[in-house]
Amino acid sequence: MSSVFANVVRAPEDPILGVTVAYHKDQSPNKLNLGVGAYRTEEGKPLVLNVVKKAEQMLVNDQSRVKEYLPIVGLADFNKLSAKLIFGADSPAIQENRVATVQCLSGTGSLRVGGEFLARHYHEHTVYIPQPTWGNHPKIFTLAGLSVKTYRYYNPETRGLDFEGMLEDLGSAPLGAIVLLHACAHNPTGVDPTIEQWEQIRQLMRSKSLLPFFDSAYQGFASGSLDADAQSVRIFVADGGECLAAQSYAKNMGLYGERVGALSIVCKTADVASKVESQLKLVIRPMYSSPPLHGASIVAAILKDGDLYNEWTLELKAMADRIISMRQELFNALQAKGTPGDWSHIVKQIGMFTFTGLNSEQVTFMTNEYHIYLTSDGRISMAGLSSRTVPHLADAIHAAVTGKA
């Protein structure tokens, strides 16, 4: 008897997660995984922050804690503290109760809930995403019921921002369209607008009533400063206009597998925010009912305790600084080898990723000859590098560029 699912076609591996699958199959002792965006120590090991261990110990020691369901919108403390973290403690939007915040399943879940809410309650169903962007963005919004278009963002010639192209494309978008913006540390390029450029983007978007939807996956991880990395979002909130923001604590607290995130919608009035929250519950309830308790409790414990918060900012800065130093080491190694081309973009780009400018053939060559795994667009996760592995990567890039293995 054949299966009723016999005609199901095998799906391709996820372009990012598939890199790790291939890496695990490789038996080489020199193999290096620079595909997935997860922080590693200098020894190449996953890191659990000390402050997270302390918070977890506090939770374990608290005998009053139970495992009851959270409300649909999640842990109240977590939501309040998350909004403060991204918008600033003195944000008028928060003080005036104009922000609806719900706990979601990390960044992906926050984007999906936001997308589904917009598909049901916003008059314009087109979302513009940067070209390039994180591979999951188009799928998330399409499945949420929105139609996806792109705007120019990256200039491969300069390996920097195509600012003119970006303004031109947003300028010709229909009135009221939704625009996805990376709050900081753009993935995959590592290229961000300056504050002055953000201000121009804000003016253009507000003049066309374009609705900003920020994806903030790396607050504090780009520059090492939580406030600096939230400037783009705060510029838009300061003008009194409306916007959405998806937050993830995967990277900045190392809580990848806990799936902790938040969606905040900044509204014009407290009354509107309250109605928006009521509708967000209707999106969430049939999707996953309510979010997990543990990760949100860790985040809330850290954000509300002054000592833990300060310790977190130090650990976060240490992670950001290590990535910045890896950029410098890789750049220096390529300079020392005399690798053809200008590699200064490696130190200019920020955040977890570097968009190397290597093409898919060069990437395949590096994987086959040097056992280095990265996505086919040439994106490398700087967080996966160490002083020990930089020379190996520099050798591989040099060979790929010069064609001399």
From Swiss-Prot:
<dbReference type="GO" id="GO:0004069">
    <property type="term" value="F:L-aspartate:2-oxoglutarate aminotransferase activity"/>
</dbReference>
<keyword id="KW-0032">Aminotransferase</keyword>
<dbReference type="GO" id="GO:0006536">
    <property type="term" value="P:glutamate metabolic process"/>
</dbReference>
<comment type="similarity">
    <text>Belongs to the class-I pyridoxal-phosphate-dependent aminotransferase family.</text>
</comment>
<dbReference type="InterPro" id="IPR004839">
    <property type="entry name" value="Aminotransferase_I/II_large"/>
</dbReference>
<dbReference type="InterPro" id="IPR004838">
    <property type="entry name" value="NHTrfase_class1_PyrdxlP-BS"/>
</dbReference>
<dbReference type="InterPro" id="IPR000796">
    <property type="entry name" value="Asp_trans"/>
</dbReference>
<dbReference type="GO" id="GO:0006531">
    <property type="term" value="P:aspartate metabolic process"/>
</dbReference>
<feature type="binding site">
    <location>
        <position position="134"/>
    </location>
    <ligand>
        <name>L-aspartate</name>
    </ligand>
</feature>
<dbReference type="InterPro" id="IPR015421">
    <property type="entry name" value="PyrdxlP-dep_Trfase_major"/>
</dbReference>
<keyword id="KW-0963">Cytoplasm</keyword>
<dbReference type="GO" id="GO:0009058">
    <property type="term" value="P:biosynthetic process"/>
</dbReference>
<keyword id="KW-0808">Transferase</keyword>
<feature type="binding site">
    <location>
        <position position="187"/>
    </location>
    <ligand>
        <name>L-aspartate</name>
    </ligand>
</feature>
<dbReference type="Pfam" id="PF00155">
    <property type="entry name" value="Aminotran_1_2"/>
</dbReference>
<dbReference type="GO" id="GO:0030170">
    <property type="term" value="F:pyridoxal phosphate binding"/>
</dbReference>
<feature type="modified residue" description="N6-(pyridoxal phosphate)lysine">
    <location>
        <position position="251"/>
    </location>
</feature>
<dbReference type="InterPro" id="IPR015422">
    <property type="entry name" value="PyrdxlP-dep_Trfase_small"/>
</dbReference>
<feature type="binding site">
    <location>
        <position position="379"/>
    </location>
    <ligand>
        <name>L-aspartate</name>
    </ligand>
</feature>
<protein>
    <recommendedName>
        <fullName>Aspartate aminotransferase, cytoplasmic</fullName>
        <ecNumber>2.6.1.1</ecNumber>
    </recommendedName>
</protein>
<keyword id="KW-0663">Pyridoxal phosphate</keyword>
<dbReference type="InterPro" id="IPR015424">
    <property type="entry name" value="PyrdxlP-dep_Trfase"/>
</dbReference>
<feature type="binding site">
    <location>
        <position position="37"/>
    </location>
    <ligand>
        <name>L-aspartate</name>
    </ligand>
</feature>
<comment type="function">
    <text>Important for the metabolism of amino acids and Krebs-cycle related organic acids. In plants, it is involved in nitrogen metabolism and in aspects of carbon and energy metabolism.</text>
</comment>
<dbReference type="GO" id="GO:0005739">
    <property type="term" value="C:mitochondrion"/>
</dbReference>
<comment type="subunit">
    <text>Homodimer.</text>
</comment>
<dbReference type="GO" id="GO:0006103">
    <property type="term" value="P:2-oxoglutarate metabolic process"/>
</dbReference>
